[in-house]
């Protein structure tokens, strides 16, 4: 928390509540998240570059066809609060979450200076992809030029592929044990949950 006077622009925020459902429509959990209102950001003050790639649907279909041809299995992994795992590359100031406001001695509310990404900011997706990409490349994964959200790795366990859609990861590999090893790698960097073998991928069954 910092005094409001230190912030060239204060980004407003809001609580976003959501019901996350499983592929069969049943409720998995209820979520509440404090998000920035990105429309209140000012260009060249709060952000400059904002583009972040996500895997194309045509690439997903191509990966699944390749998996079927080479007997690979599609597994899923989900990174918990992904945007908050990446360092914030800009100086961003956001108002405090409503209901949890702290004031200075003069009665003025402090503002939050972000150290990590926050959902709703324009560059959060870019910062997250940059952080994930750095970890994957360091581990030997190769980013594909045709679709920068696809990565591959050749090793003793055979060829593996990743398809990245924000915080959802499609992992093609030969067995559950290989997938578990990948999830362990992810957990050493970001809290990650395995979704097991997939039958429902980005709206496609």
Where do the protein language model's features map onto the residues?
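Long, low-complexity, charge-biased intrinsically disordered regions
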Residues: 1-205
């Amino acid at each position: 928390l910092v005094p409001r006077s230190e912030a060239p622009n204060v980004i407003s925020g809001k609580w976003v509540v959501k019901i996350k459902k499983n592929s069969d429509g049943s409720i998995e959990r209820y979520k509440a998240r404090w998000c920035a209102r990105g429309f209140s950001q000012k260009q060249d003050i709060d952000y400059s570059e904002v583009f972040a790639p996500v895997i194309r649907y045509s690439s997903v279909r191509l990966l699944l066809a390749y998996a079927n041809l080479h007997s690979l299995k599609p597994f899923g992994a989900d990174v918990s609060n992904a945007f908050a795992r990446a360092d914030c590359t800009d100086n961003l100031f956001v108002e405090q979450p409503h209901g949890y406001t702290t004031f200075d001695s003069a009665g003025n509310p402090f503002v939050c200076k972000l150290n990590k990404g926050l959902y709703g900011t324009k560059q959060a997706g870019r910062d997250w992809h940059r952080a994930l990409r750095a970890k994957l490349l360091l581990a030997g994964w190769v980013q594909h030029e045709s679709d920068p959200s696809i990565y591959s790795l050749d090793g003793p366990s055979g060829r593996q592929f990743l398809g990245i859609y924000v915080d959802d990861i499609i992992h093609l590999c030969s067995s559950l044990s290989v997938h578990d090893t990948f999830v362990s790698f992810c957990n050493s960097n970001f809290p990650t949950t395995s979704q097991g073998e997939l039958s429902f991928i980005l709206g496609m069954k």
